[in-house]
């Protein structure tokens, strides 16, 4: 029997909560930082969080393949893609975790036929979980309480434009800001940027640097469910199943 989106959403939410617990346990202690082949950092928190997420997803839907960042780093990309699969980044913003900036998240997205249909983002230090599984279903859950509905907004007179803190200011970001009258620029780390647009506290997020599909799938599902959009720079909806799971530059926006 194929699990429903509602059951899969609860599995992803459970996985995010289990991952958040172990991440916070490790965050509160001294921890070792190692380097992957691409020289990006990895910690025990990345690995333990990924194990817990995979266990939660496989309990409900063992037939759905899981493409998870640390598994890919250790074993390489899957040879073939199914039409339905999970994309998991167990600790998005590992550098923020290492720097103890609190800017990191847990990203769990479900892809069907090349599009994100379900997403959960956990923000451990804020004790927040954002989730969605279709139009009008985006929610924010605080500290295990009742999920509350959220929606993207039409940009106000002073739109908030988010950018990656890690990659810092760039000419392309400065050029984009020049096209948004009254823009208020706010750099920050992790997939939290998608959540702020989905909940209506930010309006634009242009991304020009490299990202992988597991960085964006959950956030895109949540933003789109909240009434926003995630597109390539030519205006096409960002799709999945690309070579190497790599994204082109993209733009996240609230309601237009």
Which sequence ranges carry the predicted segments?
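Oxyanion/phosphate-interacting regions
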Residues: 1-14, 20, 174-179, 194-256
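Residue-level signal for inorganic ion chemistry
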Residues: 19, 23, 46, 57, ...
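Glycine-rich active-site/cofactor-binding loop and its immediate structural neighborhood
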Residues: 82-124
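Acidic beta-strand-loop-alpha-helix segment within the catalytic core
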Residues: 108-195, 244-256
